[in-house]
Amino acid sequence: MDFFPVVENQQPPATMPLNVSFTNRNYDLDYDSVQPYFYCDEEENFYQQQQQSELQPPAPSEDIWKKFELLPTPPLSPSRRSGLCSPSYVAVTPFSPRGDNDGGGGSFSTADQLEMVTELLGGDMVNQSFICDPDDETFIKNIIIQDCMWSGFSAAAKLVSEKLASYQAARKDSGSPNPARGHSVCSTSSLYLQDLSAAASECIDPSVVFPYPLNDSSSPKSCASPDSSAFSPSSDSLLSSTESSPQASPEPLVLHEETPPTTSSDSEEEQEEEEEIDVVSVEKRQAPGKRSESGSPSAGGHSKPPHSPLVLKRCHVSTHQHNYAAPPSTRKDYPAAKRVKLDSVRVLRQISNNRKCTSPRSSDTEENDKRRTHNVLERQRRNELKRSFFALRDQIPELENNEKAPKVVILKKATAYILSVQAEEQKLISEKDLLRKRREQLKHKLEQLRNSCA
C-alpha cells in the first residue's frame, strides 16, 4: 500500500485527524475518507464525508487548535508501559523459526505490519510523543521541533517505514531454529524495542516543556519544585518515576527475562503511590522556601499561594462577676423560690443567646456548648453558695446586721456559735436529768406520807 508516500508527496496538509482507525484492512478507503482534509480548496465537498460515516472526525474549523497541540510533557518511560511484551503483542506478531510463508506467519503483509506497529506505538505515533534520552544531542535538531505543525505525520511515517525494515532484517538474522518458540519471540521483540530506543532520539525537545535544563543530571529532584506542579499530571508522574528509580540504565527499552514487565493495573497503582509521595515531598520542600518566595519571583511564573491559617471564630460569652463587697440586692427583694426561677430563666436566655454565635464546625460547636454549660452550672453553684452564706450570716447574732461580713468571718463566727449552742444544749440536758431525778424523789416521798396518814 502506498498510503504513507502519498501523504509525504502532498502539499502541507491542513490537518491530520488523530483518531484515524488503522484496524481496517482497506487503507485506500481510509485515505479517501480523510482526503477532503488534504484538499481544502474543494469547499463544496468539505463536509460531505462527515454525513456519510460516523467514524469521520470533526472538521478542523470546529476546534482546530486541539489538532495541532502536542502533549505538554513526554509520557512515562516505555519500560513502565504495559503491552510491550504482553501476550497480546505475542499474539499479534507470530513468528516461525523456519521463516517460510506457510500458516506459521513467517512473512507479513503490509496491512499486518501496519497493524502491528500501530498496536505497539498506539497514540504515540500520531501524537509525536516518543520518549527520548535527555542526554542525546540529536533530538534538538529534530524536524518535528523545526516545524511541529506540518512535518509531524511525515516524520512518523518515515520512522514507521525505517522500523519495519529494521524489524524484517532482525527477524531474518534470528531465523535459525531454536528449541523454544516463545524465547525467540521475546528475543525478536527485545531487538525491535532496542531499535525503537535508538530511534527515540527523534522526539520533542524537553526544553520546550520544562523550564529547567535537562543536562544537569546531578540533582534529578531539582525539577520537583513547587512550580512544576502547575504544568500537568503527566509531568508529576514523570518526576516521581525519575525520583523513585535513580539507578535506571540509559537503555530504558531493554527487556530481561528475570524482570517481567508490569501490568497496567500495577503500573497505575505504582504511579499513584509515587505521585502521592512526590506531593508530600513537594509540600515539605515548600515549607522552608516560603521566606524566599516573597523576595524573588519564581522561574516559571506559576506559584501556589500559601495555605491561609485556619481561622477559628470565637463567640463572646458574657460573664457576670459578683462584687462581694456590694450589698446583695436579691436577698430582701425576692424570696428564695422566686430567685431560683429568675436564675433559671437567665441561664436559659444565656444558653439560647450563646448558641446563635456558635461556629459552623461540629467539633467547635460541641466544645463551645460544653464550655458554656459548664460555665452556667458553675455560676449557678456559686450563686447558691453565696445565698447559703447569706442565710448563715443571718443566723449568727453577732453578724446579723453586718452585710459586708466576709466569708471567713462568717464561717468562724458560725463555728463558735454552733459550739456555744452545743455546750448550752448539754447543760440543759444535764439540768433536765437532775430535775427528773428530783421529781422521782419527791414523788416517792409523797407516797410514803400518804401511807403513814392512812
From Swiss-Prot:
Compartments (UniProt record): Nucleus, Nucleoplasm; Nucleus, Nucleolus; Nucleus; Cytoplasm
Q: Where is the composition biased (Acidic residues)?
A: 266-278
Q: Which residues are glycosylated?
A: T73
- SUPFAM superfamilies (alphabetical): HLH, helix-loop-helix DNA-binding domain (SSF47459)
List of residues that carry Phosphoserine:
S21, S77, S86, S96, S166, S174, S176, S308, S329, S344, S359, S362, S363
Q: Which residues form the bHLH domain?
A: 369-421
UniProt cross-link Glycyl lysine isopeptide (Lys-Gly) (interchain with G-Cter in SUMO2), position: K67, K158, K163, K313
Q: Spell out the Low complexity composition-biased ranges.
A: 216-252
Q: Which UniProt keywords apply?
A: Acetylation, Activator, Chromosome, Cytoplasm, DNA-binding, Glycoprotein, Isopeptide bond, Nucleus, Phosphoprotein, Proto-oncogene, Transcription, Transcription regulation, Ubl conjugation
Polar residues bias spans: 350-362
An example GO BP is: chromatin remodeling
Q: Which GO terms describe its cellular component?
A: cytoplasm; nucleolus; nucleoplasm; nucleus
Biological role stated in the UniProt entry: Transcription factor that binds DNA in a non-specific manner, yet also specifically recognizes the core sequence 5'-CAC[GA]TG-3'. Activates the transcription of growth-related genes. Binds to the VEGFA promoter, promoting VEGFA production and subsequent sprouting angiogenesis. Regulator of somatic reprogramming, controls self-renewal of embryonic stem cells. Functions with TAF6L to activate target gene expression through RNA polymerase II pause release.
Q: What is known of its domains?
A: The 9aaTAD motif is a transactivation domain present in a large number of yeast and animal transcription factors.
> What's the name of the protein?
Myc proto-oncogene protein
Q: Supply the source organism's classification.
A: Eukaryota, Metazoa, Chordata, Craniata, Vertebrata
Q: Which gene encodes it?
A: MYC
